[in-house]
Amino acid sequence: MTKSIAALREECAVLLQKYVRLKAADSDGYCACWTCGKAEHWKEMQGGHFIERGKTATKLMEENVHPQCRSCNMYGMKKASVVLAYRSAMVDFYGEDFVRDMERMASQVTKHSRQYLEEYKADIKTKIKELECELKA
């Protein structure tokens, strides 16, 4: 049975979160929370989003997802201090103009084709395998 585009898009989003956490990991597999700096193994981290995950224009943008500890991602994003820390980290890393562009994109709708999503999924899976091999080496 063919997966719906929504299901395929969700698979891509989950893979992107895994990729981002792996990419941020050091040789021992640890990465720092984007907002509080706490170091944990990449498998214990979550993929936190600057622009909430439901916004389609930014959902599959690598720049929108960063490692976050469970505390910051699940509970902290409800607190203004964590939201401000996330935005501050974004500005420090990408610059104010880029962050403002992303914030404008939050109100836009992007419809990805099945072909785009299947290619995206294959590409991100390849990148994940490469990073997993590097960590095992």
Annotate each PLM feature.
Residues K43-F50, K79-V83:
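Short Cys/His-rich "knuckle" micro-motifs
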Residues V14-Q46, C69:
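Short cysteine-rich loop/turn motifs with clustered Cys
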Residues M1-Y19, A24, A39, M102-A137:
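A boundary/linker detector
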